[in-house]
Structure formats: C-alpha cells, structure tokens
Design a protein with these regions (language model features):
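Glycine/serine-rich anion-binding loops at beta->alpha junctions
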Residues: 45-81
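A short, flexible low-complexity segment enriched in Lys/Arg and Gly/Pro that occurs
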Residues: 22-59
Length: 212
C-alpha cells in the first residue's frame, strides 16, 4: 500500500505561533541538564587512603612543613574542590515546556518541514517498505543521504514501528506525548499521520505537556 500525503489545515495556535528563541534555549538547556547522570566523583584529602602520618618532622629539614602526603598538592593526594555527585535537573514550568514545543513546531511548519500522511498501512514489518515510503515522500537527498527524521507514531502501529526502527539513529520514532523541543530542533523533518497529528493537537492545545 502506497503512502499518501494529505493536505490539512494546521492549527495556527500550535503551528503558526511566534518563535521564541530565548524560551526554546532555556527549555533545551533544562532538558539536557536533566539528562546528565551527575555521577562524577573525586576524593578529598580526608577520603583518600593513607596520609595519616606526618611525612617528616616539622623543623630542621630545610623543607616546607608538611602535615600529610594526601594534601591536594601532593602526588596521590586528594582533590581540592573536585566534582561530587549531584542532580543537575532544573524545574521547568509546564507552560514553558508547552510554549517551547509550540515555538519549535511553528519554526518547522514555517519552513515547510512538516509532512502529514493519511496512514502508513504496514500490515507486517518491512524495513524495505519503510525506506521506499521515505523516498516516496521525498525525504531523502539527491545523494541518497538520509535526513534526520522524526516520525510520530501511535502505540497501536507496532508493525510500522518495527519497520522504521531499523533505519538507524537518523530516524527518531516518538509517540505524540513524547514530542519535545530538543528532538524537534534536532530533526530536519517531522512526519505525522492524521491520527497522531490529532493527538498532538489535542495534547498541546490543552496545555498538558509534561515537565522536563
């Protein structure tokens, strides 16, 4: 079954909003910060093993006085002001997240980088058909280089999901509720089905975007 694009009127409140660059930047920074593990750790002079004994007597050697071989300026000593495990996540209001997603989608829509298909029509998983569908939509460059695509699928479209997931990191498959500012900006083109577009519009129209 051939994949057919459809003409739809995209809601202006979501796809024709003013692009707010500072807001997008703030939300993307918060999203990337939340993705950090924050497990970095170094030992201070009190945590490094050893160093309890004074290396040499206080006076009479002609050398600078030293109290421990684990001081930061000693080889094998602790680290002064080094990193410790921490949580980098930032609380971002839901309204800001929603507004940033809308700004990013409006930017893509303004550059004609959003495509809507009627339905994918995969009854069995087929990577070959997935590649053919992308080529039929004109989403491969002349040199056959794969553009970065975001394909928005429904949970029930399992065969379609299995077909596209083999195409590598340049094809990002997301659910409507997983659409986020960073992924929208990372991808060159976004492909909705009529069903997932309706779900996305319902989600963003009601302002229920999740916190980052």
């Amino acid at each position: 079954m051939a994949v057919k694009t459809v003409k739809v009127d995209l809601p202006a409140e979501i796809f024709e909003a003013k692009v707010n660059i500072p807001l997008i930047h703030q939300v993307v920074v918060a999203q990337q910060a939340a993705a950090r593990q924050g497990t970095h750790a170094t030992k201070t002079r009190g945590e490094v093993r050893g160093g309890g004994k004074k290396p040499y007597k206080q006076k009479g050697t002609g050398r600078a006085r030293q109290g421990s071989t684990r001081a930061p300026h000693w080889r094998g000593g602790g680290v002064a002001h080094g990193p410790k495990p921490r949580d980098y996540s930032q609380r971002t209001p839901k309204k800001m997240i929603r507004a940033a997603i809308i700004s990013a989608l409006s930017d893509r829509a303004g550059e004609s980088r959003i495509t809507v298909v009627d339905q994918w029509g995969f009854d069995t998983p087929s990577t070959k058909r997935a590649i053919a569908a992308i080529e039929a939509l004109g989403l491969r460059d002349v040199d056959r280089k794969q553009r970065r695509l975001m394909i928005v699928l429904d949970r029930a479209e399992r065969e379609t999901w299995l077909s596209f997931r083999n195409l590598g990191e340049r094809v990002r498959i997301v659910l409507p509720e997983e659409i986020n500012t960073y992924d929208v900006l990372l991808c060159d083109h976004i492909v909705f089905s009529t069903a997932t577009l309706a779900t996305t519009v319902a989600r963003l129209g009601s302002g229920t975007a999740e916190e980052a």
